[in-house]
Every structure is written in C-alpha cells, then in structure tokens.
Amino acid sequence: MELVTMHTHTNYTGHGHGTVAELVNAAAATGISAIAVTEHYPMSEAMDPTNEVSMPWDKMPQYLIDIAAAAAAHPAMDVLPGCEVDWLGAQEDRDFSALDFSNFVHVLGSVHYLDGWAFDDPAQEARWHDVGVDAVWRRYFEVWCEAASCREAPFTCMAHPDLVKKFGYRPSFNPQPLYDQAAEAVVAGGHMVEVNTSGLTYACAELFPAPDLLRTFFCAGIPCTIG
C-alpha cells in the first residue's frame, strides 16, 4: 500500500512546527512515498498582522528553495511544492490574477474564515454561542461552496471539507442537503477534495469529511487525496 500525505505544515508560520527538511525526513522515515508541503499562502497584514497563520511574503523564495532541497535529498520520494490558500470571501484583498502559482504543484483551498471570523480558532470559539450552531453550519457551507465552485481561484484541491465540525458542534438539522450542494460546487469548480485525518485529534473525533459527505463526493465522481 502506498502512503501519501498531501497536507502538511512547517515553522514557516506561527502555528506550525519543524523545518521543511525535518518534515520530509520524518515522512521518509515512516515510509511515505509522496508528500506535499502546503504552508498557508501569505495574507495581507490586515488579515494576519503577525503571520501566525500564514507565511510572510518575503519568505516565499526560501520556502521553495527548502522544498527543492528536500526533494533532492530524497530522490525516491515525490516531494511536491504546495501551499494552502485561505478563501476570504468579501474580505479578500489579494489579486489572484496578479499572483504566480506556477511554482506550486498542489494548491489547497480552505475556509477558516466566515465574514472575517476565524471560526475554528479556539480563542474565538465563544462566538459560536452568539451566532448559533445551525447558522454557523449554513454559513460555512455557503462560503465553502463559493470557494469550491470558483474556477478563477488557484486551488487544485479543497481541504478538510467539513472543518465546521471541528469543535464538535453539530446542527439540529440533517446536513445532507448541504453535502449535496458541496458536491455540486466541487464539480462546478473542477477540483479534488481532501480526506483529512486531523479531525480525529479534535473534539469532532472524525475524519474530514464525514462518511456521508465523503460518500456524496464519491457518488458525484469527485477525486480525493489524503492529508
């Protein structure tokens, strides 16, 4: 069985750990045959003033150099240059048409912000109770579908599709209609989706996506990768 991991982070942001070399060395030691290094693509100072959750713009050249060096050090592995691009919706202040993503083989699209609110940040979890679980779920899938259906975005794959369940909050309604909309959006955008194992470590204690959502993607013929 081939082992791959297509969603990884490093110390190029404040919430990651280890260098690119350390990451790839560890992957090689566990028998992984393909890895994508997918640090969060830079955001503006207005969105991430301390680069806690995104890479500084001036670190991008060295980041790509480090990935190339790791690939050269492990010729038996596929070491892919990648990044994770946060979909910011109306708060987006980057012009993707003016940015060059040609150096990246694997570009993850993700939704960590709802109208400027980092809904999955433990420091901002209290707002869930103000907004309401059902409303957050509906808004999340609305924004996620906007991202997934956008052909102008640089994404090759949509990451952790139902990240909204991270804290274990579940809606009072059947989410299947939202799942159907998510699958339709991915098909419209021409993207892949990711099966992300990190959900097993959070309160939701479940892969992203949930089995029913993954089944919906499968039935729609959407290709998947693993991160």
Where do the model's predicted regions map?
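Short acidic/histidine-rich active-site segments
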Residues: 40, 222-227
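Domain-core and long-helix interface of multi-subunit machines
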Residues: 102-104, 110-220
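An N-terminally biased module of ancient metal coordination in phosphate/nucleic-acid-related enzymes
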Residues: 1-89, 99, 165-169, 173-177, ...
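Short, conserved acidic/polar surface loops in the N-terminal third of protein domains
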Residues: 90-95, 118-122
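Short hydrophobic beta-strand that contains or immediately precedes a catalytic carboxylate
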Residues: 5-6, 105, 226
